[in-house]
């Protein structure tokens, strides 16, 4: 009797607690935080990291530095200024926690927090733009990457942008008209003297000290015209003024992310699979080479999956990596001697950072479908959570359920997808929105996805489709759409639609489609090929691909994948890929177009042209241009507005009152 009573009480409590939960709302973007850039202290007792939150009054994001101890039971906020701080790093002697900030009206500088206490002090007074820094092993020097300073003479009238570069546009950066370059410098912590290590017309990035502090490896493309290829190489220079850099890698593709082994005898790095000038669909491979040169060992080539975030184990016997697999991202390690891979932690989740602990184990960040990213310790291949910044908010929500599905396209291709079902979904066919990922070389994973959760919270089933062109399924799967955009991907989307309708999940009369970037491009392609969708929202998309030549930032891809339009009848390729615009009269779907005013990635002309076409054809449409926004929106109020616009548009065409 008593046991039955307790069971009844437990059920009642569970029902009450669940009833108190609520669905996501667009205004919740102001409550979500983001965790990033974890760094372990030299003795392994503390982890510094960043937390980004939203200041609703100023309509902007703020980032500050926090610490959590390795046990995960003590958390301390280290900075709390009016401006953001980022790039936390520990001095190897463990005396300081450094970070970068733009305080006191200065450009970005390095600041120090003494671990014995006290306020942060400004260490550097750099002229130019600081983009990266790295402590020397003895904590006496810091390698800096600084962009040459602007000419800021007083009372100078604005001048026209004089452009001479082949690749002259980049989102956020704008027109690449100036002749400033990122160079490597050496900063003496005691004297504050700055020595120039590299000069010239090339950019240097990613400085990494050798363990004995005598050398610095860095990445640079020093070909005749770096704008015309992706041939970045690893270079090594002695850590002293007047030294000359020596080229370490000679692969005609791209080499990057160098990491010295703990004994300094080897360098691990990431290398492209292809040595072509540019290929969108490439996979990074883990490479290891003797630090004096010699044979290159490609440890992960046979894996046929992209790897990233390489880190040496403390004993130097293995290299940890993150592996992008089908719908997940897992932690693995490669034994350097044998080349064999071992999975450390995997499952239906997504790992996004990796740091070796100085004693044993790893530090990582991980997201799951029902929880945004938190920090975790990996010990003996087991996870232990260190941070808990999301629980209070997430636990108050009734989130969509997330499950995997596999559909078959009309040509037989099998496609992995994720289905989001709204909380407390009725047992009936639902209005369903396909929200298509961008890239195209990306994928939808078992991780927390705000956009799809937000759409599901408004009563929609939401489908994510890893169409051909996505990664996580091997190089051939990614390259399947080479110079053939909007064909196989659309077959995969339509195949998923057929499957979800056949299973009684989706109402065939209430299908919608949306996406951003390549997801917006695929939205345009799909509604031009099939009229089943009753509403669409295309974000940062394009359709008249020929008109983007020299207008967007992808000149290298266009020249290498489609060719220059005036050569070899290449213009016909561009026209074939422009069918959503050239055959806009086939579109029947009411479509909303969204774009950032300053987007140089997929410029607003792509959305404007499609809006004009549908407006001319009297198809219901609207165009939303967000002032001052780039390809990725940064202003919180505009992100909230975008969700509200999704609701308004899809509700208008996909929801109806039952008779």
Predicted segments — roles?
Residues 69-73, 114-118, 188-192, 238-242, ...:
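Short loop/turn segments that connect beta-strands within beta-propeller blades
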Residues 274-276, 389-509, 516, 550:
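Cap/lid segment of the alpha/beta-hydrolase catalytic domain
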Residues 44-47, 94-98, 142-143, 216-217, ...:
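Hydrophobic beta-strand positions that form the internal "hydrophobic ladder"
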Residues 467-659:
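Active-site-proximal cap/loop segments of hydrolase catalytic domains
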Residues 42-43, 92-93, 137-138, 211-212, ...:
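Residue-level detector of Asp-centered blade-edge/turn motifs that repeat once per structural unit
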């Amino acid at each position: 009797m008593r046991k039955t009573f307790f069971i009844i009480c437990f059920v009642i409590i569970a029902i009450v607690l669940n009833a108190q939960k609520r669905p996501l709302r667009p205004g919740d973007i102001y409550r979500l935080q983001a965790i990033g850039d974890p760094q372990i202290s030299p003795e392994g007792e503390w982890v510094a990291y960043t937390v980004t939150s939203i200041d609703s009054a100023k309509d902007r994001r703020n980032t500050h530095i926090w610490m959590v101890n390795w046990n995960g039971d003590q958390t301390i906020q280290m900075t709390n200024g009016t401006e953001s701080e980022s790039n936390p790093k520990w001095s190897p002697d463990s005396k300081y926690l450094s970070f970068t900030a733009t305080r006191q009206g200065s450009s970005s500088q390095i600041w120090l927090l003494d671990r014995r206490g006290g306020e942060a002090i400004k260490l550097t007074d750099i002229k130019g733009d600081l983009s990266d820094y790295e402590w020397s092993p003895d904590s006496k020097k810091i390698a800096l990457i600084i962009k040459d300073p602007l000419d800021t003479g007083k009372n100078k009238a604005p001048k026209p942008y004089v452009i001479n570069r082949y690749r002259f546009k980049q989102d956020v950066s704008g027109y690449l008209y100036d002749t400033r370059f990122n160079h490597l410098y050496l900063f003496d912590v005691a004297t504050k003297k700055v020595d120039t290590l590299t000069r010239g017309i090339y950019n240097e990035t990613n400085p990494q000290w050798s363990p004995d502090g005598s050398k610095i490896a860095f990445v640079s493309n020093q070909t005749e015209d770096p704008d015309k290829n992706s041939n970045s190489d690893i270079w090594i220079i002695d850590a002293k003024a007047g030294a000359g850099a020596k080229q370490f890698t000679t692969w005609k593709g791209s080499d990057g992310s160098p990491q010295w082994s703990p004994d300094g005898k080897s360098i691990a790095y990431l290398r492209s699979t292809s040595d072509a000038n540019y290929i969108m669909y490439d996979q990074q491979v883990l490479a290891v080479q003797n630090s004096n040169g010699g044979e290159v060992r490609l440890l992960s080539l046979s894996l046929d999956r992209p790897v990233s975030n390489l880190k040496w184990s403390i004993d130097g016997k293995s290299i940890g990596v993150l592996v992008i697999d089908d719908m997940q991202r897992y932690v693995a390690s490669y034994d350097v001697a044998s080349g064999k891979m071992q999975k450390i932690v995997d499952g239906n989740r997504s790992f996004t950072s990796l740091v070796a602990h100085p004693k044993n184990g790893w530090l990582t960040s991980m997201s799951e479908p029902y929880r945004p990213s938190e920090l975790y310790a990996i010990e003996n291949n087991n996870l232990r959570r260190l941070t808990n910044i999301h629980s209070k908010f997430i636990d108050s929500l009734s989130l969509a359920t997330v499950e995997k599905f596999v559909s078959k396209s009309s040509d037989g291709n099998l496609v992995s997808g994720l289905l989001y079902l709204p909380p407390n979904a009725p047992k009936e066919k639902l209005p369903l929105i396909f929200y298509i990922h961008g890239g195209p070389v990306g994928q939808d994973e078992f991780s927390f996805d705000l956009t799809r959760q937000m759409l599901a919270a408004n009563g929609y089933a939401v489908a994510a489709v890893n169409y051909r062109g996505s990664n996580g399924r091997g190089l051939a799967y990614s390259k399947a759409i080479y110079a053939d955009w909007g064909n196989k991907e659309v077959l995969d989307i339509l195949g998923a639609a057929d499957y979800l309708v056949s299973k009684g999940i989706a109402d065939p009369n209430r299908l919608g489609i949306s996406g951003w970037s390549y997801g917006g491009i695929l939205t345009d392609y799909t509604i031009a090929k099939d009229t089943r969708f009753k509403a669409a929202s295309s974000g940062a998309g394009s359709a008249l691909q020929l008109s983007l030549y020299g207008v967007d930032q992808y000149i290298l891809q266009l020249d290498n994948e489609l060719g220059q339009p005036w050569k070899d009848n290449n213009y016909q390729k561009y026209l074939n890929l422009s069918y959503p615009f050239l055959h806009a009269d086939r579109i029947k779907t009411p479509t909303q177009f969204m774009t950032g005013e300053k987007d140089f990635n997929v410029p607003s002309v792509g959305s404007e042209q499609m809006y004009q076409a549908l407006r001319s054809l009297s198809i219901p449409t609207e165009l939303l241009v967000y002032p001052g926004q780039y390809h990725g929106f940064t202003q919180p109020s505009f992100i909230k507005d975008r969700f509200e616009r999704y609701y308004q548009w899809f509700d208008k065409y996909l929801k109806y009152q039952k008779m």
